[in-house]
């Protein structure tokens, strides 16, 4: 009953929020610098969606995120709620690599396209390579990108095998990887489930992992290093003092995001 009520409120709050954000975002998304204005609005959308589902958001280790230089964020993927949680928690401008089918969704797809998110067609290797090349272009332009190295959501909570594309981008560009561990999304909304369970999502930022001086042939070692970091961050190991976003404080904090 609680999950049914939370889902009903989530839909009543989230649907009009998504429609409005999609329409407005599509218009302002093309105001230079492209996508930045839409991303600020998306943070409001993300917090509203989470609050509508009675999902509390905590963020830990935001001070570890470098400012003024591009990075590759890499996060574990547990739930559809990963997207709003990460949008709300990441304190810098960032572009996501997301599966191509999301861009076909009315309003939501329009908004993420306007934000400059990059579609990835996992079924078409050539198109997938092109998407990673586009991500590399964004990095060269000074933009950070976020990649789910598993490329799909886990069903049992275990980390899935990593794909190498994001690691090759970071190595070739010589920019650090910031591991981001999510704890709680799968409990609130697991894959193949459509009823939200009220709860808490914690987003933990790890220390940047440098890639300067490493060769492309070192990608296997780098992948294992990131995997170990994500395994630790998904639990309570090395957690920084939490920052909680709730109610009006959640909305107010958006204005201080950079």
Describe each region flagged by the PLM.
Residues 78-130, 134:
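Membrane-embedded segments
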Residues 1-58, 110-114:
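A transmembrane-helix-recognition feature enriched in membrane-embedded lipid enzymes
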Residues 60, 97-99, 121-122, 149, ...:
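Thr-Gly-centered strand-to-loop micro-motif
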Residues 129-258:
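Non-catalytic C-terminal accessory region of glycerolipid acyltransferases
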Residues 49-52, 73-74, 122-126, 155-157:
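Short, flexible loop segments at the rims of nucleotide/cofactor-binding pockets, characterized by
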Residues 6-13, 42-98:
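Conserved H-X4-D acyltransferase segment
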């Amino acid at each position: 009953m609680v999950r049914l009520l939370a889902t009903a409120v989530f839909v009543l709050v989230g649907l009009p929020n998504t429609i409005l954000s999609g329409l407005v975002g599509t218009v302002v998304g093309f105001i230079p610098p492209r996508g930045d204005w839409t991303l600020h609005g998306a943070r409001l959308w993300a917090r509203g969606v989470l609050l509508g589902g009675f999902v509390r958001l905590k963020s830990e280790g935001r001070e570890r995120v470098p400012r003024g230089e591009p990075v590759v964020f890499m996060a574990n993927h547990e739930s559809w709620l990963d997207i709003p949680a990460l949008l709300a928690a990441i304190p810098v401008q960032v572009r996501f690599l997301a599966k191509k089918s999301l861009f076909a969704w009315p309003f939501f797809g329009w908004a993420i396209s306007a934000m400059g998110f990059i579609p990835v067609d996992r079924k078409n290797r050539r198109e997938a390579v092109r998407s990673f090349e586009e991500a590399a272009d964004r990095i060269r332009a000074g933009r950070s990108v976020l990649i789910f190295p598993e490329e799909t959501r886990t069903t049992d909570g275990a980390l899935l095998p990593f794909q190498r594309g994001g690691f090759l981008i970071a190595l070739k560009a010589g920019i650090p990887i910031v591991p981001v561990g999510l704890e709680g999304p799968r409990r609130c909304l697991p894959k193949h489930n459509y009823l939200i369970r009220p709860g808490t999502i914690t987003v933990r930022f790890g220390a940047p992992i440098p890639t300067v001086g490493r060769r492309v042939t070192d990608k296997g070692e780098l992948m294992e290093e990131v995997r170990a970091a994500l395994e630790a961050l998904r639990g309570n190991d090395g957690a920084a003092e939490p920052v909680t976003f709730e109610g009006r404080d959640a909305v107010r904090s958006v204005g201080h995001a950079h």
